[in-house]
Amino acid sequence: LWMVSEGGTDIIDLTTLKPTVPRDAKGVLKNILNQPAVHVMKDSKGCIWLHCANKLNRIVFNEKGDVETVSTLDLVVLNGPNIALQDIDEDGKIWAGINGEILKVDWDSQGKLTTTPIAECLKFEPGTYISDFLMKENEVWISTDRGLFRYNKSGNIVKRYEHDPNNPRSLSQNYLTDLSITNDKQLIIATLRGVNIYNPMTDDFECIASGDFQNGSSNLLNSNFINCILTEEDHICLGT
């Protein structure tokens, strides 16, 4: 279990529930783990991607679980509290939201990390914070602090969704913090003004929120400031 915080990265052995550090013959990992970190993920190939100290690290393990190589991409500066990382293509080459743009992170023959823009249409306004993206059918949904974007990979086109004060079926706010998909393929969008559920039949949203800022709102939430969401079977867990 890998956990990141301002104090660094902690690794817990779930069989003993004690701290552990994978064997690393080159001794590179220890220094990385001591740096303040904001995001960690595992890709489809079993590699760990760790963002810390404005750097993105790819940690590769051998069959014994020992560290084989550590590759680093420098100057990965955040535009917000976190960084969006996802193995969208399930090839181990992750998509990353960096400096208002979505890039694919690859590596060369020497193991050095390189980046390539996914598409020209996925370059956003300067300073845009990309909080998350996920794959749903053949489209990638992208949450930002400036609305929701729907990218069709086949057609290489983007559609943007924004809050409209005159439309109660629009997004409840443009600052989006997280995305998730339920078992029945519903897209859930977390914002700092409640939760939005996308309706593909009408191409709009239903809002769940506390208070009376929108007609039909309820007191289902203890706060409208949603930081993260997790869907599990028929349940939606909200962190506020």
Pin down the residues of each PLM region:
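Carboxylate-rich, polar loop motifs that coordinate divalent cations or form catalytic acidic clusters
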Residues: 1-240
